Amino acid sequence: MTSRRRPRLGGLAAIAALTLALTACGGSGGGTAGGEQKSIKLVVAQYTEGTRPYWDELIKSFEAAHPGKNVDLQVIDWGNLQSQVNTMVQTKQFPDVLNINVFADYAEAGLLYRADEVVSKEVLADFLPSFADNASYDGAQYGLPFVATVNGMYYNKTILEKAGFKKPPATWDEFRAAVKAIKALPGGYVPYGLALGAEAGDYEFGTWMRANGGDWRTGGKWTVNGDRAVETLEFLKTLTQDGYTQPNPGQTNRPDGTWPLFAQGKVGMVYASFGTRAFLDAVDKAGVKYGATTHPTNHGAEPSTHGIQDYLMAFKKDGNQQLVREFLDYFYQADNYAKYLKVEGLLPTTASASTLMRKDPKVSPIVDMVAKARFDPTSQPVWSELRGTVAAELGTAVGPSGDPRAILGKFQQIAERS
């Protein structure tokens, strides 16, 4: 998500097998049998130093409003979260509510409540549709959209103005004209900072692919090597070979590659996370005049951002459903939820919190980008393996001897094994 969290973690197939086995052994009970629970366990990831103080305060106010009810909090850093959750699952010590960046394997194993079983109709309807869809498995929503980042294109206003552009390019044709003009400027500017390295090359490629009218999956089928995908990677290769990027973009990552170049005022345009301090602190400190927008589109594609989200989820346990529901409804009250997002510096997944956060003129333009978010197919079991291969090999396609169609064909074969 941002530098405050880890990327999507691997080992999902093993988790799925484990949870399925536990379910077969009766490790998950119903939510209404055995009497109503008076205490639940909440396990959350630590995003910043403000994580625990926020939850401590929220729980204190919740317990004051619900006498006799208790919420036991456990905060775990991202580096240890998945392994500790694995242990909880293996020993059948399931949390009642969990915050993590995966959910589909637990849903597949029958360990989770559906979203409509643990939040009110009002909360369920408040989730932004694209985030709710991305929290669904096999036609039902199990994950509760928790926090979001959206990614798109930042541009250096000064460089674009020098090149004769008062606004960022909106189409591929305008983009081609812009990078050509920037390259012709004195000063050795990099027209576009392209990061196709292992850190997040799939994010950048996927964003350009959607801007070209393609996607990883279309109509329920994998289209990794579809015509629009191939055209996109060929476009990025041409961009590279024509000298419109920094050297060796196939091995370039964002944090130590394109982002520092942008902060130094050397790059015209770059892919980055909207509002993330890991990117903007250095940019603001350097006094770079910048704007943020969606990537230029082709073939009339709808402008979009790349969305990434983490989830809350509720595990089925005897007697816990009512208290879980009360607590989650309390957390998702607009004021409570918006306060959390402000503490962590993250973006909303609900309409009500979006409305509140738009009152901040610095945050409002970024919040408006959330509704444009499109997502990677993270609920597909093969995605973890596919993304790992893409991360390792995608960058080779834009080298002098790279073959975009061949490399995407290899990725397609991996996807279709699912």
Model region roles, listed by residue range:
Residues 60, 64, 163, 238-245, ...:
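Extracytoplasmic/periplasmic substrate-recognition and gating elements
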Residues 95-96, 123-160, 302-303, 373-380:
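A structural signal for short loop-to-beta-strand junctions that line the ligand-binding cleft
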Residues 101-150, 204, 211, 289-293, ...:
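Hinge/lid segment of periplasmic solute-binding proteins
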Residues 134, 293, 341-389:
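Long, aromatic- and glycine/proline-rich binding clefts that accommodate carbohydrate-like moieties
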Residues 142-146, 151, 173-223, 267:
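Extracytoplasmic/periplasmic solute-binding protein
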Residues 161-162, 368-418:
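Conserved C-terminal helix/tail region of periplasmic/extracytoplasmic solute-binding proteins
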Residues 179-180, 221-250:
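Glycine-centered hinge/linker elements that transmit conformational signals in sensory
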